[in-house]
C-alpha cells in the first residue's frame, strides 16, 4: 500500500521536472527548429532546380536527336535526287552525237538550248544556214553609200587662200591673194599693179592680169 503513493509522487515529480527543463530550454529548441526549417527549404529549392535542369537536358537531347534525324532525311533526299540525275534514263544519258561534231538532245535542239539557255542556235532549213540569236543579218542586196570623190567642197569652208571657190560673187577684200573678176580694182590691194585708164575698160587685159596674179 505504501508503494502506490510513492509511485504517484515520483511520476508527478518527474513530469514537473521535464516541463521545467523544457521551459528553460524553449529558446534553444526554437532556434534549432527554425534552423532545421531553413535547411529543409533550401534542400527543397536545390532539389527543384536539379529537376528542372534534368528536364532541360532531356529536352536538349531530344532536340538534338530531332535535328540529326532531319539532317539524315535531307541527305537521303539529296542522294535520291543525285541518283535520278545520274540515271541512264535521264536527260544526260539521252544525249547523242550529231555528225560527230556537236552533242544534241533527242529533240534535235542544240546542246546550248538546254544547257546555256542564252546562246541559242536556230536551224533554218530553208536558207540552210545557222543564225545566232541577238544578231543582225545584213542582206547582200543592201547598198552602202560611198562618199563621192567628186563631191563639191563647200565654199564657205575653203582651206586654200589662193583658190577662189566662190566664183559667182565678188571676192572678199580681206584676202589679197584672190583676184577680182571684174574691172573694179581695189585700191587697198598692195599685190595688184597699177593700171592705166586704157586698160580698165578692156576685159582681155583684165583676165590676163588676173590669171598672172593668181599664179603668183
Swiss-Prot record:
> Which Pfam families does the record cross-reference, listed alphabetically?
Orthopox_A36R
Residues on the membrane's Extracellular side span: 1
Q: Which residues cross the membrane?
A: 2-22
Chief localisation class: host cell
Positions in the Cytoplasmic compartment = 23-216
**What is the recorded post-translational modification?**
Phosphorylated on Tyr-112 and Tyr-132. Phosphorylations activate the host ARP2-ARP3 complex and lead to actin nucleation.
Report whether Transmembrane shows up as a keyword of the record. Answer: yes
Q: Which domain of life is it from?
A: Viruses
Keywords (A to Z) from UniProt: Host cell membrane, Host membrane, Host-virus interaction, Membrane, Phosphoprotein, Transmembrane, Transmembrane helix
Q: What GO CC annotations are associated with the protein?
A: host cell plasma membrane; membrane
Q: Where in the cell is it found?
A: Host cell membrane
Topology in membrane: Single-pass membrane protein
Quote the subunit structure annotation.
Interacts with host NCK. Interacts with protein OPG161 (via C-terminus). Interacts with protein OPG056. Interacts (via C-terminus) with host kinesin light chain/KLC1. Interacts with host intersectin-1/ITSN1 and EPS15.
Which family does the entry's similarity section mention?
Belongs to the orthopoxvirus OPG164 protein family.
Record function comment: Involved in the intracellular transport and egress of virions to the host cell surface with help of protein OPG056. Also participates in the formation of actin tails at the plasma membrane to allow efficient actin-based motility and thus cell to cell transmission of viral particles. Recruits host intersectin-1/ITSN1 and activates host CDC42 to drive ARP2/3-mediated actin polymerization.
Q: What is the official name of this protein in its record?
A: Protein OPG164
- Source organism: Variola virus (isolate Human/India/Ind3/1967)
Amino acid at each position: 500500500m505504501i508503494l502506490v503513493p510513492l509511485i504517484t509522487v515520483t511520476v508527478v515529480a518527474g513530469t514537473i521536472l521535464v516541463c521545467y527543463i523544457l521551459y528553460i530550454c524553449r529558446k534553444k529548441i526554437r532556434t534549432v527548429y527554425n534552423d532545421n526549417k531553413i535547411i529543409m527549404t533550401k534542400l527543397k529549392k536545390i532539389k527543384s532546380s536539379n529537376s528542372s535542369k534534368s528536364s532541360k537536358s532531356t529536352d536538349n537531347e531530344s532536340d538534338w536527336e530531332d535535328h540529326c534525324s532531319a539532317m539524315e532525311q535531307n541527305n537521303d533526299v539529296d542522294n535520291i535526287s543525285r541518283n535520278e540525275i545520274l540515271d541512264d534514263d535521264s536527260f544526260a544519258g539521252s544525249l547523242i552525237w550529231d555528225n560527230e561534231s556537236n552533242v544534241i538532245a533527242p529533240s534535235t535542239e542544240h546542246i546550248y538550248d538546254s544547257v546555256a539557255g542564252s546562246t541559242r542556235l536556230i536551224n533554218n532549213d530553208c536558207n540552210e544556214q545557222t543564225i545566232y540569236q541577238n544578231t543582225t543579218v545584213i542582206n547582200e542586196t543592201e547598198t552602202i553609200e560611198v562618199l563621192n570623190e567628186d563631191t563639191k567642197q563647200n565654199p564657205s569652208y575653203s582651206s586654200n587662200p589662193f583658190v577662189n571657190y566662190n566664183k559667182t560673187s565678188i571676192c572678199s577684200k580681206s584676202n589679197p591673194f584672190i583676184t577680182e573678176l571684174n574691172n573694179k580694182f581695189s585700191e587697198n590691194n598692195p599685190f595688184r599693179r597699177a593700171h592705166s585708164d586704157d586698160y580698165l575698160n578692156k576685159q582681155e587685159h583684165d583676165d590676163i592680169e588676173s590669171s598672172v596674179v593668181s599664179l603668183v
